[in-house]
Amino acid sequence: HEMRKRVFTSKSFTNEHIIGAILFEKTMLSKVNGEFTADYLWNEKKIVSFLKVDKGLAEQNNGVKLMKPIPELETELKEAVEKHVFGTKMRSVIYEPNVEGIKAIVAQQFEFAKTICDAGLVPIIEPEVDINAPEKEKCEEILKAEIIEKLKTWNKEDKIMFKFTIPTIANHYLDLYDYECVVRIVALSGGYDIDKAVELLAKNNRMIASFSRALLQDLNANQSQEEF
């Protein structure tokens, strides 16, 4: 929390470049300069907060790792709403172009997303495709087709976001914005270093960075405020 607090209170952490921050539950329940984290970020920085709600990944099956069950989800969502959080984030991972596996990933993500929308929050649906997947492009093709099937019948009032691995074919996900419910599409760095991630991201219109690892990798507690 101290590390995150130092990031949040830094002069260079502003809404000129940052629109949202993903929090762990512990960070959401902690305070920054006397205010709960989400309130601090909104009141002082005009940056919205997202709560990480998944409980990690299940064992790999059908070329994918689904999320473990989230038994306390409704309680956590209620807490998040009380703490003025804007949305949530939940991650699952695709390793192979297995239609059954990818279908299951998308079904699970959208099922949780509905519960989250019903609670009044905006879910970030994150079906990561492993950057080392031998048939990454094929995985992305199946993933997008499955997502479109869901979006066709999705209530346009239930706003959602997507967090994707930067696609092999630039702008692969761009037309998901044709659906009114899609607020933002963000990219994960997925193990690329910052230079590579930025270079690939630049080829994708309307896709914004959600690169915690790439952005935080050079920080450490012993740096002066300026270096930090």
Regions found by a protein language model. Name each.
Residues 69, 98-105, 136-143, 228:
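Residue-level preference for long, well-ordered alpha-helices that form the structural scaffold
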Residues 117-168:
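Aromatic-anchored, glycine/proline-accented short structural segments
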Residues 1-86, 94-96, 146-149, 153-161, ...:
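Alpha/beta catalytic barrel-like cores
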Residues 60-65, 88-103, 130-136:
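Surface-exposed cleft-lining segments at the edges of enzyme active sites
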Residues 84-92, 121-128:
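Glycine-rich, often proline-containing surface loops adjacent to acidic residues and nearby aromatics
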Residues 75, 79, 104-118, 141-150, ...:
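Alpha-helical scaffolding segments of alpha/beta enzyme cores, especially the outer helices
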